[in-house]
Design a protein with these regions (language model features):
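Glycine-rich phosphate/diphosphate-binding loop of Rossmann-like nucleotide-binding domains
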Residues: 15-16, 28-33, 38-39, 147-216, ...
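Glycine-rich phosphate/nucleotide-binding loop
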Residues: 113-127, 132-140, 223-227, 231-341
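Short beta-strand segments
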Residues: 6, 35-36, 58-60, 101-103, ...
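Phosphate/nucleotide-donor binding subsite
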Residues: 50-96
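N-terminal phosphate-binding or glycine-rich loops at protein starts, especially the Walker A/P-loop
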Residues: 1-43
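Short glycine/serine/threonine-rich phosphate/pyrophosphate-binding segments
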Residues: 12-17, 81-94, 98-112, 119, ...
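Glycine-rich phosphate-binding loop
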Residues: 90-109, 187, 192-198, 202-275
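Short, glycine-rich nucleotide/cofactor-binding loops
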Residues: 3-15, 145-155, 299-304
Length: 342
């Protein structure tokens, strides 16, 4: 398995991507292509103790970088020698099995759509992070790729999320819920009501295990396995979950270290608290799958450290090996979406 990593994307590039590549090579045996400025990558490899480029690691030179402040709509086209563009071109040409970037989300979405292409028949690609719930995990789709959606897009997202939950996470007959302000079918705006009708019809035909509308608190309690949302609502939910996790971890630590008695309790609970913190840590997940693209693409968090990049490689391998893209391609007709003309 060969994975491409954008070595210039993210807050801690190129150090975090390069060191993450070395960890992934050691832990998963994956071959890695690092795209970016060769001199910068070699410098980081040297800092990591590598006197030469290790076996299983390749460098694809790219002199330009798509910055987070660049306009996503134009940056990808203007910077043709960027680490992002070079990596996506390699993926399109079949030089690797997947691509990871912690750079600009908008540029990655635009580049993946224009270069690697969506699966024929799909209207939009969507970001599908895995979030923790009280009973395990759930797929949240979309969480920022599409701020404005139609009911057709959300129907498509439900299928994509369901395939991901089943094929990658191993959930049998994943329960699909529509993120809304109430559980009743009449709740929500026009988009939510129209989407509810489409999802209910798909559920009646046995194509989806649709359980109805679901509120955010119920979803986090484990009420469903796939949370369907437009990118605007989904992103707010995701950021709220991340913020709440930081709040809980910080407050819990303060409570358990404010006196001698609580410090003793902290020592007794230390291992359990470490597991709790690990469950809430986005670096443990690795990244967010960009579903609907014809090859595996994963968006790593902008603040990803080396461990996060390593975990993103694990996740990308899981997507590549799952057969999810082939399954989606073969079942587009179920989604009631007429293929667009090339």
């Amino acid at each position: 398995m060969k994975i491409i990593i954008d070595a210039m994307g993210g807050d801690f590039a190129p150090e975090a991507p390069v060191r993450g590549a070395l960890l992934a090579r050691e832990k998963y045996g994956a071959d890695i292509i690092l795209t970016g400025r060769t001199a910068d990558i070699l410098r980081e490899l040297e800092k990591a103790g590598c006197k030469e480029v290790p076996q299983g690691i390749e460098i694809a030179n790219a002199e330009e970088v798509v910055e987070i402040c660049d306009d996503p709509a134009t940056a990808f086209k203007q910077k043709k020698d960027s680490s992002l563009t070079v990596g996506l071109n390699l993926l399109r040409d079949g030089q690797a099995d997947g691509f990871i970037s912690a750079g600009s989300t908008g540029a990655l979405l635009a580049g993946a759509t224009l270069v690697v292409k969506r699966i024929r028949g799909l209207r939009r690609a969507a970001l599908a992070p895995t979030i923790p719930t009280m009973t395990g995990k759930a797929v949240l789709i979309d969480c920022g790729a599409n701020a404005e959606c139609t009911s057709e897009y959300l129907l498509q997202f439900a299928y994509l999320g369901s395939y991901y939950a089943e094929k990658v996470l191993g959930i049998v007959q994943p329960r699909v819920g529509l993120l809304n302000i109430g559980a009743e079918p009449s709740k929500g705006d026009t988009l939510r009501r129209e989407t509810y009708a489409r999802l209910k019809e798909a559920g009646g035909q046995g194509h989806l295990n649709f359980i109805g509308n679901i509120e955010a608190n119920t979803a986090l309690a484990g009420g469903c396995d796939v949370i369907v949302a437009d990118g605007y609502s989904g992103n707010i939910m995701l950021k709220s979950v991340e913020g709440a996790a930081k709040l809980m971890s910080g407050e819990l630590k303060k409570m358990l270290t404010k006196s001698a008695k609580t410090k003793l309790a902290y020592l007794l609970l230390k291992d359990g608290l470490a597991d709790f913190k690990k469950m809430l840590d986005p670096n443990e997940v690795g990244g967010t799958a960009l579903l609907g693209i014809s090859r595996p693409v994963v968006k790593a968090h902008g603040s990803s450290n080396a461990a996060a990049f390593c975990n993103a490689v694990r996740q990308t391998i899981a997507v590549a090996e799952s057969g999810i893209i082939a399954d989606i391609t073969q079942n587009v007709d179920k989604m009631k979406i007429t293929p667009e003309k090339d």
